[in-house]
């Protein structure tokens, strides 16, 4: 009894590792696409913890791919330059001046910061944009009217990503994309992550957000829906109970699962080590979406 009390903390840590074991075994060698954004990009401690999670995932045999946004940083830069930020259904209205700022912030600052932090923590990351190696081909998105240089992805060059994964690197992707018209397009990072996950037939697509997940009542944080099948997700999407930035998130999760991704997750990136909690624990922390009902596991 004395020894159990003395080593209580160590035993608890061992139990955590034991709980994670079946998940590590199941997901070894599998690809996980992570959309990194929201408050987890602004808080230095959270930023470091997210990257620690990603490096750990790599070390235990998963193949993480990071697709990042940068909305708050872009907003700050636009405000500094006196340019107003406008959104339609969660998508940024992007004129030529805004597109220049978006590309500068995403590829020139945020992408390199993420790569540097992963490398500092012992991983090996390579940062690219959707324009590099013709990774993400886009065309003008007019589904919400003309909102400028906003693109929808029409092709993903998976050879570029596969090459990095095979060499042991963690790809870090900024979602600025190229068009056959020679123009650069701003693609919503959630949508880009979903398209990349679809193209790779990834095991998981995980979107880090600033909410607990999908709530049945947006005013009640305890109303988290932990699991949804496709039918439920589509019904919820069409119910009008979500708005703003959650629209493209749920939409891309639905499309990803329809097109070969096994599970899509919307989780709270404000929580410490949220990625590890969602992937390697029995309960998970956010909303998981799959093709059919799941009864007894988080796999």
UniProtKB/Swiss-Prot annotation:
- Give the residues annotated as coiled coil: none
- InterPro entries associated with the record: AceGlu_kinase-like_sf (IPR036393), AcgluKinase_fam (IPR004662), ArgB (IPR037528), Asp/Glu/Uridylate_kinase (IPR001048), NAGK-C (IPR041727)
Q: Where in the cell is it found?
A: Cytoplasm
- Would you tell me the Gene Ontology cellular component terms? cytoplasm
- Report the EC code(s) recorded for this entry: 2.7.2.8
Q: Does the keyword ATP-binding apply?
A: yes
Annotated residues that bind substrate are located at 70-71, 92, 186
| Pathway(s) the chain acts in | Amino-acid biosynthesis; L-arginine biosynthesis; N(2)-acetyl-L-ornithine from L-glutamate: step 2/4
Marked site, Transition state stabilizer, at 35, 249
Its predominant location is cytoplasm
Q: Name one GO biological process term.
A: L-arginine biosynthetic process
Membrane-traversing stretches:
none
HAMAP family recorded for this chain?
Answer: ArgB
Describe the function of this protein. Catalyzes the ATP-dependent phosphorylation of N-acetyl-L-glutamate.
Q: What is the name of this protein?
A: Acetylglutamate kinase
Organism of derivation: Thermoanaerobacter pseudethanolicus (strain ATCC 33223 / 39E) (Clostridium thermohydrosulfuricum)
């Amino acid at each position: 009894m004395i020894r159990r009390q003395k080593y209580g903390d160590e035993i608890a840590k061992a139990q955590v590792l034991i709980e994670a074991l079946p998940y590590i075994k199941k997901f070894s060698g599998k690809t996980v696409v992570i959309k990194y954004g929201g408050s987890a990009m602004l808080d230095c401690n959270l930023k470091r913890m997210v990257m620690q999670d990603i490096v750990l995932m790599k070390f235990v045999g998963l193949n993480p791919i990071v697709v990042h946004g940068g909305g708050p940083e872009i907003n700050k830069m636009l405000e500094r330059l006196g340019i107003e930020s406008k959104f339609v259904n969660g998508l940024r209205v992007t004129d030529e001046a805004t597109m220049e700022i978006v590309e500068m912030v995403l590829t020139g600052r945020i992408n390199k910061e993420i790569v540097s932090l992963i490398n500092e923590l012992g991983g090996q990351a390579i940062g690219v944009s959707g324009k590099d190696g013709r990774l993400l081909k886009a065309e003008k998105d007019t589904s919400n009217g003309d909102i400028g240089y906003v693109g929808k992805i029409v092709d993903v060059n998976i050879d570029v990503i596969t090459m990095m994964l095979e060499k042991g690197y963690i790809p870090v992707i900024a979602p600025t994309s190229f068009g056959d018209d020679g123009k650069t397009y701003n693609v919503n990072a959630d949508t880009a992550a979903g398209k990349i996950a679809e193209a790779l037939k990834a095991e998981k697509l995980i979107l880090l957000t600033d909410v607990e997940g999908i709530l049945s009542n947006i005013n009640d944080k305890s109303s988290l829906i932990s699991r949804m099948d496709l039918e439920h997700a589509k019904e919820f999407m069409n119910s009008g109970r979500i708005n703003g930035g959650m629209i493209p998130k749920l939409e891309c999760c639905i499309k990803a699962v329809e097109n070969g991704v096994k599970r899509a997750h919307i989780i709270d990136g404000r929580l410490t080590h949220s990625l590890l909690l969602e992937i390697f624990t029995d309960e998970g922390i956010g909303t998981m979406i799959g093709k059919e009902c799941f009864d007894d596991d988080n796999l």
